Amino acid sequence: MDFTSLETTTFEEVVIALGSNVGNRMNNFKEALRLMKDYGISVTRHSCLYETEPVHVTDQPRFLNAAIRGVTKLKPHELLNVLKKIEKEMGREENGLRYGPRPLDLDILFYGKHKIISDKLIIPHERIWERPFVLAPLVDLLGTEDIDNDKIVAYWHSLSMHSGGIFQAWERLGGESLLGKDGIIQRVIPIGDHLWDFSKKTYVMGILNLTPDSFSDGGKFQSVDTAVSRVRSMISEGVDIIDIGAQSTRPMASRISSQEEIDRLIPVLKVVRGMAEMKGKLISVDTFNSEVALEAIRNGADILNDVSGGSLDENMHKVVADSDVPYMIMHMRGDPCTMQNKENLEYNEICKDVATELYERVREAELSGIPAWRIMIDPGIGFSKGIDHNLDIVMELPKIREEMAKKSIGLSHAPILIGPSRKRFLGDICGRPEASERDAATVACVTAGILKGANIIRVHNVRDNVDAARLCDAMMTKRFKNVD
């Protein structure tokens, strides 16, 4: 049946797959998303980002693949024409080699609850069910609860011809077991000029506080020389990421002006960015101030680490969306002065509540234009949490992912950071009132977190925690090999 005359006077929900293996693949995706918006396609969800081997024509570069959900008033064939126009604007040759190299490939996977068969267009896309590089990002756009609560998504599931819907179709191809296996498909995050796979190892983030009032090392590294010396020390100990902060976020910390924070941060950031020893290392900047974030990004920050997730500065999401840096979103209630107030410590189920509130922050960021493939999450150990809350989070990290997956499987795959380093709850448990005496407890805590699925650990003592991370990674690698 030909649906070329399908009338569309209201918005229809669509799913569009993206692929690229020529030129700057991430820029190709970024420009494609911008052009979709210009042509009347509003993106509502992003998948994770995947690097995949080419199929059919194998003598070509690896692809980046992703997918988006969006809404549009464009009719099916109007949408097809728009996507072809975008491909052409991005340099794709109209009569190029089939399955060959291309700067951009845009395919309509679903269009509302419509089946469409014409000479130019078949929806649902006829090869969805046989392609892991299509199904992986497609699954990301769904939630585990959608099939019961969303009629359009339930219809998409029905098209798979499997009782378990799209999820079962993905599992029949191998599902998550395909990731990292023989290089077929990798879930990656773009940082700078490289793609990072946070499932391969635990990344150690070393803390560099440029503040006079941080709870553990305030005042130690305020000069450029002492800060650089500290960075060199952390590099020698095996750090992966340097997290630089110029505004204290300890309980009851006073908020300084944007200019003061910039004046503390930028001189150090510039020097650290230029250090030869930083090759292969990343720089994260810890700030909840959008003006500071903008200057940090301009001066070489690779990651923006925001303890408020944008709740303390309404311009933060726009600053991050306009950049190319990943965004670390942490769970916190209130601000550093109010986060430990009684009303901010009341939870029904800590992991479920944290996941729900984190999801809300993440969705606000995504709808502001920050793709899911640039988002990382932090459950906020020590922020708006009591002792038992912190312990439950560390021991039940999979529960946070599970709760996130109910709303968005893609967002549930975001790298998780934990930051228990030297925090008061460790001292309360171990009888260590001095923060500097809590390193052994920190190692124990991050070890538990890594074994429960943490991807990044944020610590003061780099050497000991690098050892802990390496041992945990070795144990988990051995466990997975034994399972195979």
Swiss-Prot record:
Disruption phenotype: No visible phenotype. Increased sensitivity to oxidative stress. GO terms for cellular component: cytosol. The lineage of its organism: Eukaryota, Viridiplantae, Streptophyta, Embryophyta, Tracheophyta. Its cofactor is Mg(2+). InterPro entries: DHP_synth-like, DHP_synth_dom, Dihydropteroate_synth-like_sf, Hppk, Hppk_sf, Pterin-binding_dom. This is Folate synthesis bifunctional protein. One of its GO terms (biological process) is folic acid biosynthetic process. Residues 15-141 are annotated as: HPPK. It is found in: Cytoplasm, Cytosol. It catalyses: 6-hydroxymethyl-7,8-dihydropterin + ATP = (7,8-dihydropterin-6-yl)methyl diphosphate + AMP + H(+); (7,8-dihydropterin-6-yl)methyl diphosphate + 4-aminobenzoate = 7,8-dihydropteroate + diphosphate. Induction: Up-regulated by slat stress. Up-regulated by oxidative stress. The gene is CytHPPK/DHPS.
